[in-house]
C-alpha cells in the first residue's frame, strides 16, 4: 500500500523554546521585536469603524488607538480580536413600538417615571471583505461536544496587522450577560482560536498583552501547547509568565463575573490537551466557581493598571490569596485620530508634539503661542466639524442640531453605567436651568446603554421626563441616542466644556476626557481615573460627600466655565494649564513607550 503523502500545515508549529533557558535566567524579555516575533495584543473589545469592527466602548477604542500608534512608531505589532459579524446601533423607540398610544414624551406621562420612551438596539450585519480583510484559513475549537469552525482573517498595514477570528453566529460584543455561556464561548474562541491563528500565519509573540481578563484564554492556550509538546509544567509556567502582560481596567475584583466548573467542562476543557494544565486549572476553583482575573494574574509576570490611582487602589487577589500589585501605565489616545485637524496642525507647527504624538522637550514654552484669540479661532473650526457630524444624529425630539460659533455647549458623552452618573446634572433641574439660561447655553447628553440594564433605562427616562417638563431645558438639553466614535469626535471638536463625573474610586482611567482636553475643551471632573494623575488644580474639580453636594459643586463649576470662556485671560490660563499638565499623559505614543519600557522590548530596523 502506498503511503499517503505528507502535507505540512502551519498549525503543526509549536511555540519554540530555543530561548527558554535564557528566559529562566533574566528578568527582562528578548530586547528586539521583529516581523516574525511581534508585539501581540489580544482584546475582546476593538472599536475601529474605519476597519469594520465596532466592538466596544472606551476599552475597544483604546485597543484600536494602540495599534494605530504602534503603526506610526513603526513597531511590529499584531492585534488579535474577533471580527463581529453584527454591530449594534441604538435609537430612541417611538411610542407605538413600545405598545403605547401617547406621544413620545406626553405631558401627562412625564409626571410618571414610566414614560413611553426607551433606547432600542438594532443589529446590522457586517461583511469583513468590505473593509479590506482577506481570508487566511480556518481553525477549530471544541465546545459542548461540537467542533466549531472559526475563520481567520487579516488586514495588513506597513508594520502592524489586525488578525481576527470570526464566524456567522459569533454575535455582537458582549452578547449575553456576564458569566453566560455565550460570553464564555466568545472568550474561549478568541483565546484558543486566536492563538491558533497566530501559528497559522507563523507568528511567535515576543510578548502577549492581555487587554482585560476576557483574553485570559490566550495565555492558557500558550501554556497548554508548551506542556502538551513536552515542556515541564513549571518551566512552561515560567516561560508564559515572562512573556505575558496583563492589563486590568477594573478596580474591584468582586464586580467581575464568575464561571462555573460545569461551564468549563463544556467550553474550556475540550480545548485543553495537557493533563497537567487541566489539573492546575481545576485547583483554581473555589466552590466550583472561578474568576478569570485570579488565574490571569498567575499567568502574567507583568501586570498594570491604567492610571496611577487605579494601580494604587485596585483590590485584587490571585488564586493564592496574595494581593496583586499593578504598575501604573495610564491610558493614552491616538492624537492623530482624535484631535481636530486644525488643532493638530497648530500643535505640530508650534513644536508642541512630535511626529509620533509625544510632547516635545520644550512643549511648555511652545504652548505660549496658544492665545485666547487662537483658542477661539481653533474652536470655531471644531464647531464646523461638529455641525457636519450632527446632521446624522437627531436629538430626542427628532431635531437635527446646528450650533452657531458663539453658542456655548456642554457635553456629557460616555457609556451609560451607574458609576459614571449621567443623571448628576439633573439632580435639580431648576438649578441646571439657572446655570444655562443666562448664557443661552446648551447641554448635550449621549452614551450607549447596555441591553438589559433596566436601571440605566429608567434613569434616562427620568432625565428626559425632567427635561420635557421645563420649557427651557426641553429646547436646550439634547439627548443623542446612537453614540459612536464619529459622534464622540465631533463633540470633542466642537463643544466648549466636557463633564466627567464618575464616582471617585470607580473609574479606572477613562479616555473621553483626554480627547476633550486635547481639543481645547475645559474639563469639569471629579478627581478619578486618569484625571487624578495630576493635582486638582489642573481641572475644574467637582467635590462633595453626597450626590446632592456633588451636584451643587457641578453647577458651580459649570457657571465658572461659562465665565472663563467670556474672559480672555482666564481662558488662556485655564486651557494652557490643562494642556501643560495633561498633554504628556494624553499621548498614546507615551503609553506605548511605557509598555515597551515595562517589557524591555525595542524594535529592530
Question: What are the roles of these predicted feature ranges?
Answer:
Residues 1-605:
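Catalytic cores of carbohydrate-active enzymes across secretory and cytosolic contexts
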Amino acid at each position: 500500500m502506498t503511503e499517503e503523502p505528507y502535507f505540512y500545515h502551519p498549525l503543526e508549529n509549536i511555540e519554540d523554546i530555543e530561548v527558554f533557558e535564557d528566559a529562566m535566567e533574566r528578568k527582562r524579555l528578548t530586547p528586539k521585536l521583529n516581523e516574525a516575533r511581534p508585539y501581540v495584543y489580544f482584546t475582546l473589545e476593538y472599536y475601529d469603524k474605519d476597519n469594520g469592527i465596532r466592538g466596544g466602548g472606551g476599552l475597544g477604542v483604546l485597543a484600536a488607538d494602540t495599534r494605530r500608534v504602534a503603526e506610526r512608531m513603526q513597531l511590529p505589532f499584531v492585534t488579535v480580536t474577533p471580527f463581529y459579524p453584527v454591530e449594534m446601533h441604538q435609537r430612541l423607540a417611538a411610542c407605538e413600538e413600545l405598545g403605547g398610544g401617547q406621544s413620545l414624551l406626553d405631558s401627562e406621562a412625564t409626571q410618571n417615571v414610566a414614560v413611553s420612551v426607551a433606547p432600542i438596539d438594532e443589529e446590522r450585519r457586517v461583511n469583513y471583505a468590505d473593509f479590506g480583510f482577506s481570508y487566511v484559513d480556518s481553525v477549530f475549537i471544541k465546545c459542548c461536544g461540537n467542533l466549531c469552525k472559526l475563520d481567520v482573517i487579516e488586514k495588513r498595514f506597513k508594520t502592524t496587522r489586525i488578525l481576527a477570528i470570526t464566524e456567522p453566529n459569533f454575535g455582537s460584543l458582549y452578547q449575553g450577560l456576564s458569566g453566560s455561556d455565550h460570553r464564555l464561548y466568545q472568550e474561549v474562541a478568541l483565546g484558543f482560536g486566536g492563538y491558533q491563528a497566530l501559528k497559522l500565519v507563523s507568528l511567535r509573540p515576543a510578548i502577549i498583552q492581555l487587554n482585560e481578563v476576557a483574553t485570559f484564554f490566550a495565555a492558557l492556550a500558550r501554556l497548554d501547547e508548551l506542556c502538551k509538546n513536552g515542556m515541564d509544567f513549571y518551566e512552561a509556567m515560567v516561560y508564559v509568565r515572562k512573556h505575558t502582560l496583563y492589563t486590568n481596567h477594573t478596580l474591584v475584583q468582586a464586580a467581575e463575573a464568575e464561571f462555573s466548573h460545569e461551564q468549563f467542562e463544556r467550553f474550556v476543557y475540550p480545548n485543553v490537551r495537557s493533563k497537567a494544565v487541566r489539573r492546575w486549572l481545576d485547583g483554581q476553583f473555589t466552590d466550583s466557581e472561578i474568576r478569570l482575573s485570579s488565574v490571569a494574574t498567575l499567568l502574567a509576570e507583568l501586570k498594570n493598571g491604567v492610571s496611577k490611582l487605579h494601580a494604587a487602589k485596585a483590590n485584587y487577589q490571585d488564586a493564592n490569596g496574595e494581593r496583586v500589585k499593578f504598575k501604573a501605565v495610564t491610558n493614552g489616545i491616538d492624537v492623530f485620530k482624535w484631535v481636530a485637524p486644525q488643532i493638530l496642525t497648530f500643535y505640530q507647527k508650534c513644536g508642541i508634539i512630535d511626529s509620533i504624538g509625544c510632547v516635545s522637550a520644550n512643549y511648555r514654552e511652545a504652548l505660549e503661542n496658544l492665545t485666547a484669540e487662537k483658542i477661539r479661532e481653533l474652536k470655531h473650526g471644531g464647531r464646523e466639524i461638529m455641525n457636519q457630524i450632527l446632521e446624522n444624529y437627531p436629538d430626542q425630539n427628532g431635531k437635527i442640531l446646528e450650533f452657531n460659533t458663539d453658542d456655548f455647549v456642554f457635553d456629557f458623552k460616555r457609556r451609560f453605567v451607574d458609576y459614571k452618573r449621567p443623571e448628576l446634572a439633573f439632580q435639580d433641574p431648576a438649578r441646571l436651568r439657572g446655570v444655562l439660561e443666562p448664557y443661552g447655553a446648551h447641554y448635550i447628553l449621549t452614551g450607549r446603554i447596555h441591553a438589559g440594564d433596566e436601571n440605566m433605562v429608567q434613569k434616562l427616562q427620568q432625565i428626559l421626563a425632567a427635561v420635557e417638563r421645563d420649557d427651557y431645558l426641553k429646547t436646550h438639553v439634547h439627548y443623542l441616542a446612537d453614540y459612536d466614535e464619529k459622534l464622540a469626535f465631533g463633540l470633542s471638536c466642537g463643544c466648549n466644556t466636557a463633564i466627567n463625573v464618575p464616582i471617585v474610586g470607580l473609574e479606572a482611567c477613562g479616555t473621553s476626557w483626554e480627547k476633550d482636553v486635547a481639543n481645547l475643551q475645559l474639563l469639569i471632573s471629579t478627581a478619578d481615573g486618569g484625571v487624578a494623575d495630576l493635582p486638582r488644580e489642573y481641572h475644574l474639580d467637582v467635590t462633595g460627600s453626597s450626590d446632592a453636594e456633588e451636584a451643587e459643586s457641578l453647577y458651580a463649576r459649570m457657571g465658572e466655565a461659562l465665565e472663563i470662556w467670556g474672559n480672555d485671560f482666564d481662558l488662556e490660563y485655564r486651557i494652557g494649564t490643562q494642556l501643560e499638565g495633561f498633554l504628556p499623559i494624553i499621548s498614546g505614543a507615551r503609553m506605548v513607550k511605557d509598555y515597551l519600557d515595562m517589557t524591555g522590548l525595542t524594535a529592530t530596523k
